[in-house]
Amino acid sequence: VGICPALERAFDYSAAKGPVVLLTEYQTPAALRRAGAKRLADWLARRTVRSAADVAARAVEAAQSQATALPGEKRAAKLVCDLAHQLLALDEWIKDTDREIREAFHLDERAEVIESLPGMGPILGAEFLAIVGDLSGYADAGRLAAHAGLAPVSRDSGRRTGNHHRPKRYHRRIRHVFYMAAQTAMMRPGPSRDYYLKKRAEGLIHTQALLALARRRVDVLWAMLRDKRLFTPTPPPSRPA
C-alpha cells in the first residue's frame, strides 16, 4: 500500500510467514526504527518466526532508508495490519483443511496402495478417490485414462477407420491429479523418470512426455488397485485385466 517501498521490496511475502507476522504489529518505518533490530528479533522469536534476527535486521534496514511519513500512513497501516491477520488466519485454515483431508484419506482402505505410487501423496490421492469413487464406473484402465483426457478417442466414420484424436471433453481435475503426480515422480530416480527420459529421447517435448508418463501411470495405478498391492519398481507378471 505504499507506506514503505523499501520494506515491500525487502521480502517475498508470498513465500515466507515471518514478514507477514511482522506486519501484524509493525507497519510503518517509524515503528520499526523505534523497536530496533534486537527488540524486534526477540518479538518475532517469541512468535516462533524462523530466522527472526535476519527478518528483524532487514526490516529495520529498510525502515532506516525512509525518514518521511507519507500522507494517510496511519490509515494504511491499519489496513496492512488487518490484511496480515487475515492472511495468517487463512494460512491456518488451509493447514487445518489439509490435515482433515489427509486424515479422511487414510481412513480409506485403498489409501496405502495409492500413496505407495511415487508422486501420489494424500492430497492428490484424496482428490482421486473423490472423483472416481469405487471405480465401478470404469470398465478398465483405458476408460479411466479416457475420462482423464489421457487416451485418444476414436472418431471413425463410415468411410474412415483408425481415426483417433485427443478428446475435447474430459475431467480436468482427474487429469490434473495424474499430471501433477507424474511431474513429481519424474523428478526422482526410478521407473517414472526413466520412462519420461525415454519419451524425451524419442523427440517428445516436456509436456508431451509428461502426459505420456501420466497415461502409463493410469495403467499402473489401476493394476495396483485391482490386485490390492503396493507399488514396486519392478512390475509383477502381467495378468488379464
PLM regions with names:
Residues 1-241:
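A detector of single, family-specific signature residues
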